[in-house]
Amino acid sequence: MEPYSALLAVTILCLTSTMGVSGDCSTNISPKKGLDKAKYFSGTWYVTHYLDKDPQVTDPYCSSFTPKESGGTVKEALYHFNSKKKTSFYNIGEGKLGSSGVQYTAKYNTVDKKRKEIEPADPKDSYTLTVLEADDSSALVHICLREGPKDLGDLYTVLSHQKTGEPSATVKNAVAQAGLKLNDFVDTKTLSCTYDDQFTSM
């Protein structure tokens, strides 16, 4: 269970082994139409804010990832840091890009910091990432985590190419349009985050 729940992604990006989310994911989530996908597939993203819509017990976490797309296939290098336990997790995700907007369902394997596989992808577990907005500096994404047929709940993340900071006005507007309040998100600048930029930039 821990390698699965270590994913967050986000893209791409899960919480931690104690994230405890439950409940169905929202069914009305759609990617932004007409979004230039190059705005999203543009280097390493850092999760600067996140909102778990149905938490039970959630450890604070930090996450970064680099998504790349080629021929309709998305691959991600994902790094996660549990700031309470001071533990790190590494994953590689892969999935197919949908035909409308930037949305993909991916499976992931667990690797070490040199990308050597520790545990292969479980075909029953996956995450669906939907890009709601993205510009040159920040993005808003929705993530639905699944363990087998069970949804683990909605997760919204605000991404930036900087490790800390506020999202752009465009992304702030997208947060509001989604019926969310940025003040309800966890701001990761308070978590003493560490990152492995060498892993995500490989």
UniProtKB/Swiss-Prot annotation:
Upper lineage ranks? Eukaryota, Metazoa, Ecdysozoa, Arthropoda, Hexapoda
Give the family per the record.
Answer: Belongs to the calycin superfamily. Nitrophorin family.
Tissue specificity statement from the Swiss-Prot or TrEMBL entry: Salivary gland (at protein level).
Signal sequence span is 1-23
Put simply, this protein is called Nitrophorin-3
Where the protein is mainly located, per its record? secreted
- Single biological process term from Gene Ontology: vasodilation
| Subunit comment | Interacts weakly with host coagulation factor IX (F9) (inactive and activated) in the presence of Ca(2+).
Question: What are the disulphide bonds in this sequence?
Answer: C25-C144, C62-C193
- Entry keyword set: Disulfide bond, Heme, Hemostasis impairing toxin, Iron, Metal-binding, Platelet aggregation inhibiting toxin, Secreted, Signal, Toxin, Vasoactive, Vasodilator
Q: Name one GO molecular function term.
A: toxin activity
Q: What does this protein do?
A: Heme-based protein that deliver nitric oxide gas (NO) to the victim while feeding, resulting in vasodilation and inhibition of platelet aggregation. Reversibly binds nitric oxide (NO). Also binds tightly to histamine, which is released by the host to induce wound healing. Exhibits weak anticoagulant activity.
- Origin, by domain of life? Eukaryota
